[in-house]
Amino acid sequence: MAGNYGAFGIQGVSGSPGTGAGAGVSGVNLPALRSHNAALVLDLLRTAGAAGISRLELAERTGLTPQAVSKITARLRADGLATEAGRRASTGGKPRTVLRLVPEAGHAVGLHLDRDELTAVLCDLTGAVVAERRAPLDLGAGAEAVVEGAAGEVSALLAGVSPLGVGVALPGPLDHTLGVLHRVTGFPEWDGFALRDALAGRLGLPVVVDKDTNAAALGVAVGTGAPSGSDSGSGFGSGFGLDSGSGFGFAGGGSFAYLHLGTGLGAGLVIGGVVHRGARTGAGEFGHQVIQLDGPLCECGNRGCIEVLCLDAVGRGTLAEAARVLGAGAANLVGLLDIDLVLLGGRTVAAHEEEFVRGVGAVLEERARREGGGAPVPVRVAPGGARGVAEGAAQLLLAPLFGRGEG
């Protein structure tokens, strides 16, 4: 089914900030923007779920004419992306036919290359995981060996499925646009390696490369699941325990920081509803901000980085200290960027969720008390668990189909 996307003109849809199901963003009735309008409709079908949505509702939500919506949905049905989901009673007229997305009409692979482990997931158009593989990985074994092993795992995962492509997430720094790695902390041999081209050549599929933290943040931003400990799973904004009028969420323009603590420490930033990568994909190198000038030497060459202080504390088993250090860095981000929410993820956090949420939250609460500016910024555990980064990597391919994901 993937081959139909290019013919329909939605393969490369990048979207613009704030477009999406709940944003109230109008479509544009111009032939040149047919892909944009199709993405708006497709995203509404996605968020409507199995219950579906009528053509009239699609027109009302997008601002497109009923005729334009009918043409778009006819193409979507012809391409196998949408199908009828029954009929719904209406006021003062005949029942309306409702349409829904066909999740199995397309798939994407999300590949998380951690320093010592590989996770690969196959996701349908809704982002749901339909297959998964894990394997040990040595990121220091050399680029060619890693590419060969990763390609083998992806091929085994696909088992005959033809996906849109492969999203790859791994520690930075790197160039997202070119798919080229820089000096990954602890693995200088990766500097300058064109991972995107190497893996695409090996698999014969489109490949997108991003930092693990950016991928995880994207997965949260476009998803509808709620983080652990939140009040509701009904949607992105409400799922974080924030009031429905807060405007928080990818489409609503909210901002959050995703802090990933595992074999390293980094951040993914969503500012004004979009992933903030920076001009050179340099945003989010959170672990290497110095907070202790005479601190221990970090593998990056600096002293007193948050990463080395936090990982040293974890290694000693002093989780309260590790959480306090992480909280100090989170407080810096809150003060610098005025974000709405701090999300915590990564295997170290997953093993000690309560300790890290409590410890980071305590630092932010103390900051709020000192400044007298109201309630502290909330701290939550990010959704997705151990495969959150891999699921976010799949969204590097899926999100643009729905007019989302590009900052």
Model-derived segments and their meaning:
Residues A108-H112, P163-G167, F256-H260, G266-G268, ...:
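Short glycine-aspartate micro-motif
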Residues V129, P136-G225, G249-S255, F356-E366:
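Glycine-rich phosphate-binding loop and adjoining helix at the ATP-binding site
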Residues G282-I291:
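Short, intrinsically disordered, charge-biased short linear motifs at domain edges
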